[in-house]
UniProtKB/Swiss-Prot annotation:
GO biological process: ribosomal large subunit assembly; rRNA processing
Purpose of the protein: Involved in pre-rRNA processing and required for biogenesis of the large (60S) ribosomal subunit. Required for proper development.
Protein name: Ribosome biogenesis protein BRX1 homolog 2
Subcellular location(s) of the protein: Nucleus, Nucleolus
Species of the source: Arabidopsis thaliana (Mouse-ear cress)
């Protein structure tokens, strides 16, 4: 057996001095491995410098009850064109619809609304609203043609971002400038939206004709083979093919608030469909009254101008 070591022979270890400096930070771990701290700081700095205005537009699209199938198909076409919109169930079109829709917009976390209101199964009105502070516009929708009934040859990818074009008439008056800005915010798809595609292959055209806003949707068609590459400025080779839908907007009133408030603009040329139908009824009633008057005049003329008796009328009665 070995000899036991004496306590005097063992030397005590020297005490280690602890540094007051904090431990180095551990690098961030990602799916691709450990991430260096300098890289993370560089990305944060880049995000801070690039962060500016970010478009977070969300549009709520809904309609009133008892809407006709034709107008409903138009609404569904618009929903398919706007990937940043949210479709909701029907809302009762009562006098308190403004408060109901404002609450619904807030619940859906939206800041714009397109509300299609159908009356008498004939007339379609569209509210375009910025919530909660306004403004809001009420349109009469005319000349409605949905995609299903036209069957046009144009086709573009669902969810792609459109180019918005406006006629030069939008810059002549203040109310047209306001409508142009609202149409840009509602129909313009935000960049890098999660449901949108990051390229443009169709055009939304808004043009003013006879104080009405006419809407058209065209596909940008570029005929080329796999080997051919079109230059950025080669617009002469691009063609436009209509996709649909088609509709016409007649502005009625512009309000300062959401679904109401002080009137900013009222269209002096607007005639309601009820007045047009009343005039048509009066014209029809006038035609019937003219017929009755013509019959009475004919009878009075016959009574005032009787026919002379014919001397040969009873000539052959004696032979019988």
């Amino acid at each position: 057996m070995g000899r036991k070591r004496k306590h005097s022979e063992t030397e005590a270890p020297a005490p280690v001095k602890k540094s007051d400096e904090p431990a180095p930070d551990r690098p961030k771990r990602t799916l691709l491995g450990w991430k260096d701290k300098s890289e993370g700081e560089a990305e944060k700095a880049k995000a801070l410098t690039s962060s500016g205005f970010k478009n977070k537009e969300k549009v709520l699209v809904t309609c009133s009850r008892r809407i006709s199938f034709r107008y409903r198909s138009l609404m569904l076409n618009i929903v398919s064109l706007l990937p940043h919109c949210k479709k909701d169930s029907k809302v009762e079109a009562k006098s308190s619809k403004g408060a109901t829709l404002n609450e619904l917009i807030e619940l859906k976390n939206s800041n714009s609304c397109l509300f299609f209101e159908c009356r008498k199964h004939k007339d379609l009105y569209m509210w375009m609203v910025k919530s909660p502070n306004g403004p809001s516009v009420k349109f009469l929708v005319k000349a409605v043609h949905a995609m299903e009934e036209m069957k046009l040859t144009g086709n573009h990818l669902k969810g792609s971002r459109p180019l918005l074009t406006f006629s030069s008439n939008f810059d002549k008056d203040a109310h047209w400038k306001l409508l142009k800005e609202m149409l840009t915010q509602v129909f313009g798809i935000p960049k890098e939206h999660r449901k949108s595609k990051p390229y443009h292959d169709h055009v939304f055209v808004f043009s003013i004709v006879d104080e009405h806003i006419w809407f058209r949707n065209y596909q940008i068609s570029v005929p080329h083979n796999e080997s051919d590459k079109i230059a950025k400025g080669g617009l002469d080779k691009m063609t436009l093919i209509e996709v649909g839908p088609r509709f016409c907007l007649n502005p009625i009133k512009i309000f300062a608030g959401s679904f109401g408030g002080p009137t900013l603009y009222e269209n002096p040329l607007y005639v309601s469909p009820n007045q047009i139908r009343a005039l048509e009824k009066r014209n029809k009633a006038g035609k019937f009254a003219k017929k009755i008057k013509a019959k009475t005049r004919k009878k009075m003329h016959e009574l005032s101008n009787p026919l002379e008796p014919d001397e040969f009328a009873d000539m052959w009665k004696d032979d019988e």
